[in-house]
Amino acid sequence: KLEIPQLNVAEYHRPYVAAWLETADQKVVGNLTVLYDVKKKDKAGEKWLKDMRQWWRKSGRDLAMPVDGVSGATRAPGEHTLTFPGAKALLDKLPAGEYQVVVEAAREAGGRELVRVPFQWPLKSAQSVPAKGKEELGNVVVQLKP
C-alpha cells in the first residue's frame, strides 16, 4: 500500500514513483514499479524519470521505458494498493538474507523522498511491514506472503 499525500502548494504535480527490491548492502535485485506520465506525447514523461535520483542511478538509466509489467501511470493523492505479480519469481531466486523494498517519489516543482522497508527472506509467515514518509510519501506498507 502506498499513500500519496495531498500537498497544499500553488502548483501541484502528481509524483513520479519508483519501487524496487534491493539487498541489505543496497544492490538492486529488481524493479517492482515505475509510475510516471506514460502517455505524454513523444515520451516527454520520461524526461523527469531522472529526478528519482537513487532509482535512476541504480537501475533506471539502463532500462528502455516503458517496461512491460513495471511501468504505469502516476497516481492521484490518496491510498493506493499496488501488486507486483513478477515479484514472486524474483524472490524465489534469492538466497536467504536481509532485503528491502525501496520506494522513491519525486514531483516536478516539488520535492523528492525515499523510504526503505526492510524484511528477512525467506518468510516464515505473512508479514505486513510499515514505514512512513515525511512529505512526498505518506504511509508505505509492504505486505509479504510466503
Name each region found by the language model.
Residues 18-22:
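Beta-strand signatures of extracellular beta-sandwich domains
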Residues 1-12, 35-39:
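Short amphipathic, basic-aromatic surface patches that mediate peripheral association
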Residues 11-17, 96-98:
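Short coil-to-beta strand junction motifs in C2/discoidin
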Residues 24-94:
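Structured domain cores in non-transmembrane regions
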Residues 11, 30, 43, 112-114:
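Generic domain-boundary/flexible-linker signal
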Residues 82, 92-146:
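Glycine-rich, aromatic-bearing surface loops/beta-hairpins
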Residues 4-6, 23, 88-90, 105-109:
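Beta-strand elements of well-folded, non-transmembrane domains
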